[in-house]
Curated annotation (Swiss-Prot):
Keywords: Cell membrane, Lipid biosynthesis, Lipid metabolism, Membrane, Phospholipid biosynthesis, Phospholipid metabolism, Transferase, Transmembrane, Transmembrane helix. This is Glycerol-3-phosphate acyltransferase. One of its GO terms (cellular component) is plasma membrane. Pfam families: G3P_acyltransf. It is a multi-pass membrane protein.
Amino acid sequence: MKIIIMLIIAYLIGAIPSGVIIGKFFFHTDIRQAGSGNIGTTNTYRVLGPTAGTIVMVMDILKGTIAALQPTLLFHMNNRYTLLIGLAAILGHTFSIYIGFKGGKAVATSAGILLAYNWEFFLIASAIMLLLVYTTSMVSVASMTAFPIVTLIAIFYYQDWLLSLVAFALTLFIFYRHRSNIARIKNGTESLVHFGLGWRRQQRANRK
């Protein structure tokens, strides 16, 4: 029964639409009606600016972390339960009950779960992600590249079967949630964040 209750709470925490809340309350903008329509960090960054984007990213990470920490903080259960409970937060973020069972792509919330389970692994994953975002200026490409790399690290360096399994599942889920991005990447129409080497290359090309 405890696990069922924690799964429900984790889903409800994960379902909190950070981007919608920040957009409506502080910018009088419904992020779902602007840019790509996604409620996550990247679209918030593009539409509302870096401050709003950073706040939404932190909120989405914390959603995953707080939800996943329930077993260890409240019931002193094995740390491995954090990954199980955390998956419910990802479902909440992706299919939010508060906004008609729609949501974001769960990259930041997934990172939050990793933080709850293994902070060192979270830092490694974050460093890889930031490096890829800086190199490509495309969060979608960075996400779809970082997760497979992180999965390999879990398998071969940490040799943690549960972490490896969850990382692999998250990789598949991230690719599934980025279907529209993959189509835009193939067509050369994927938007860049105004940051990093990819953005600079595009700016130089536009000036020629």
